[in-house]
Every structure is written in C-alpha cells, then in structure tokens.
Amino acid sequence: MTMRKLKKYKPTKFRVRGSKYNKDAADFAVAFIESLCHTKGTWAGKKFELIDWQEQIIRDLFGILKSNGYRQFNTAYIEIPKKQGKSELAAAVALLLTCGDGEERAEVYGCAADRQQASIVFEVAADMVRMCPALNKRVKILASQKRIIYLPTNSFYQVLSA
C-alpha cells in the first residue's frame, strides 16, 4: 500500500499580515515526527510517515511564523474521523512540543473529557518515547502521574481531565 505523500505544499490562506512560511521550521517539525514510530495496529514499529493531509497540518502549524519569529498558530482545532490515527498524530505533536521545540520548561497539556480518554494519547506518546533510543535516554516517564519530562529542558507533557 502506497502512502499519499504531500507533493507540493501550499501554505494556508489563513495567515496574518506579515507572517511567512519558514521551510526550515516546517521541515524540522516533519522530520521530528517522522523519526518516531507508530505504536499500534498494522503500522506498529514502523516509522511515522505523514500522509498528505497530516503533513499539511504540521507544515501550517509549525512553519508559518509571524514577523517576530513566533509561530502564528498556538491553538488548532482539528476534526479527524475514527480510525485515522488521531492518537498517534496527537502524541507525536505533544512530543514535538515537549522535546523538539527547544523551549526551557515548556508545559504541554493533553486534555479530554475524562482521565481515561486523555490517557490514551499519553500511553501512545510514552510508547513512542520507549521506541526511540534518542528520546528514551533523555525522557523520564512518570506513568502514575501521566507525565512525560524531557530532562534537557525540564519541559513536560501532562494529562488533564475535565
């Protein structure tokens, strides 16, 4: 089965005046995610290859920067149907924000209606860390607290529920 890859990226039309697409920032985000492995189903253990619509989202969120150099988008609402890899993509983005952003003491929260639902993405992220030797030696997983700490920057990913 061949994956639908993004052939030509076209930045979103929802940009503020002065914002620009930074290919290096977008490439870094894509490369970080694609260095992780899938944890479930048919693709378990295989590298995370973003398909076209996933890569479009990642490039828009992480590659469009305001004139001050900060990302334009700091919140995203994305609807994805069942069995389309929501948990895997959310976990990969959470790890990118926690471990790949370079921000000291970054706080990344995974929120859901209840703790069990929020724990699903946490478990996927924890498994991704365990499957990635480079992250595994730099990350502390506190399973009982549903927290992942990236030791070099003291950044963390924490599960919250309503």
Language-model features and meaning:
Residues 2-162:
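Phosphate/NTP-binding elements of NTP-utilizing enzymes
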